[in-house]
Each structure stands twice: as structure tokens, then as C-alpha cells.
């Protein structure tokens, strides 16, 4: 079995592992890491109303320091496969690019971390760390692109229950914006969704005095919520953002004043807030506008996406040094973008995200330069060299 990053990535891409299907992807890693001396566990998690999902945990070494590589082998659907210039699951290499769904997000990153680890172990007698003291592990899920209830969140709980302790983690998500080495994600904003309801009184449009139209009221509330900033940002985060995503009254008739209006919204929030304080702030602003005249309520959706940041320090410094050595670029330490599985890992150890360039992820003809796969492998190898120095 070939152990270079390109070969591993091609093997993974050829597995059509659209969530919740595994399609053999974890088996590729199970054999690869098992042959290298890792203790490998396949763990299946269940949740009512959701598909059972396979996950993989692999570790070599029994002592600290302990560094983990994390990732997901599941991918989003390819869309119209006839629109791809190369098969969505072909793993074809053309003109210096590897094509296929998941190449960037994030089978390529997993392949590079695996290849780098195998190279490192080969150069150090098959054991991590000085004199064999240290551990390297892989935390790989098949449930990230969908509802993420049977993936990393439960894999971390399972690992902790069996006594696994992690010192640091690298999540190989496509963190770079334009060029390999331009960005490390050291945190993520929190995410909270909700639905604002405004109650009115249904009636005939010809007799408005007998009705109470909730539409002007919900419009006033929406305007108030989006016109006043939630905050001005912080040292590590951009300002929090509240965005309305739909407004509806469920009224197909043009001669009926609706009895209720509702608006869905999402907030991406920074470290000025947690879920409880954010909810309280929004509810207070709604109450200020509503007074005793407008009847409102907010239904909050459950959220497992709290804000977090890994403070810059020795670990981020060594990752930056490894990136600079290979690319000549000093990466920005960034907290932008959406949520990731780092939100589950941060409760167990400091975590940073660094992988490929994310420009084509989730797109038709998703692809990564072969040269970037080679460079990312060298970067991860450099991280291991410095980590166990």
C-alpha cells in the first residue's frame, strides 16, 4: 500500500463517502495506520433519528507529550456529476491537480497528516518522541458534513472515558484562503439560531380595526435587531453578526390579515458572549421594542457551537515555524469562517486548524494542487519534528 500523500488522498477520494456512508474510507486509514504499528479502533455511534456512523481512533505510543491529528472522511454530495470535468470520485490527477469530492475538504489534509506521520516514524525507529517517549493519534469521523451528532463529539467522549489524554491537536480543515500557508485557524465564533414569533389577530383586510397585523411589528423588530451592533469585536474576533434568514406568515390569501409572523435568524458570536448572555441580550432588545404592545416570543434552537480561541503560545509558534520553513509565508492567526469539529476538541486540549486552500471546497471540480499536498506533508512533518524535539 503506497504511503505518500497523493496516493493516500486518491484512495480516499475514490471512496464515495457522502454522509452518512463510509464507502471504505475509514478502512483505507485503518489498514494504513495498523500496518505502521498503530493501535486502531473502529467505533460506531448511534442517536435516535440519525444514521449510525463509523469513527476511527488510532494511537501509537503510550506516554506524553501526545499530539493528535483530527479530521473527517465524509463529504458533501457531488451535485450534478455530469458537470464535473473529471469524475467526482475518480481521484484523477490532471495538469498538476488532484480532482474529486473531498480532495480539499478534507481527505487531502488527512492524507498529508498520515503520510507525514509515517515518514516521521520511519525516520525515528517506528516510535514517536525522544527515546520513544510520546504519542501520536488520529481522530477521524464520518459525521461532520451533516448534523454531526455521531462523530467527533462522541469520539472525544469515548476517548476520554477510556483514559486518553491529549496535549494538542491539529485539525486538517482547509484553513487557507488563497495560498498554502496564509492562515491558521486558532478559534471559531459561536453559532446560535432562533425563531422570532410575533402574535397578531387574524382578520379581513377590509376591517383592519378588527384585526392586529403582525407584519409591521415584526418588520420593526427586525430593523431594530439588525441596526444596532451586538459588539465591536475583540482582539481575536470580528464583530458578532446577526442575520435573518427567512420571514414568513404562512398566509396564501391576499384578503386576510395573518394572525402570526415569524422570522428565523442566526448569530455568529465572538468571545464577548456565551449562549446564555447572547440570548439574554437579544431578548432584552426585543422586549425594549415590543413594550406591552407587541406579543413576542423567541424559540431558541439547541446549539453545540460555543465560541472558543486557542491562545497563541509555544504550540502555535511551532506550527507557524513549520509553515514558514516550507512556504516562506508567515500565516495569519485567524478566527473567521463557520463552525468546525474543533468546537468539540477544544474541551479536551488546545486545537488549531491548518490544511489545504479552501477555494474549491464543496464546488464542482473540487481540486487541490499536487504540489500543495507535498508541501502540506512537509509542514506536518515539520510540526512533528518540532513537537518532539
Swiss-Prot record:
UniProt cofactor(s): Zn(2+); Co(2+)
CDD domains for this protein: M20_DapE_proteobac
MF terms (GO), sorted A to Z: acetylornithine deacetylase activity; cobalt ion binding; succinyl-diaminopimelate desuccinylase activity; zinc ion binding
Pathway: Amino-acid biosynthesis; L-lysine biosynthesis via DAP pathway; LL-2,6-diaminopimelate from (S)-tetrahydrodipicolinate (succinylase route): step 3/3
UniProt remark on cofactor binding: Binds 2 Zn(2+) or Co(2+) ions per subunit.
Pfam families reported in the protein's UniProt record: M20_dimer (PF07687), Peptidase_M20 (PF01546)
One annotated GO biological process: L-arginine biosynthetic process
Active site (catalytic residues): 74, 144 (proton acceptor)
Enzyme class: hydrolase
Binding site for Zn(2+) 1: 72, 105, 173
Catalytic reaction annotation: N-succinyl-(2S,6S)-2,6-diaminopimelate + H2O = (2S,6S)-2,6-diaminopimelate + succinate
Superkingdom of source: Bacteria
Keywords: Amino-acid biosynthesis, Cobalt, Diaminopimelate biosynthesis, Hydrolase, Lysine biosynthesis, Metal-binding, Zinc
Chain sites annotated for binding Zn(2+) 2: 105, 145, 362
Similarity remark: Belongs to the peptidase M20A family. DapE subfamily.
Assembly, per entry: Homodimer.
Name of protein: Succinyl-diaminopimelate desuccinylase
Taxonomic source organism: Nitrobacter hamburgensis (strain DSM 10229 / NCIMB 13809 / X14)
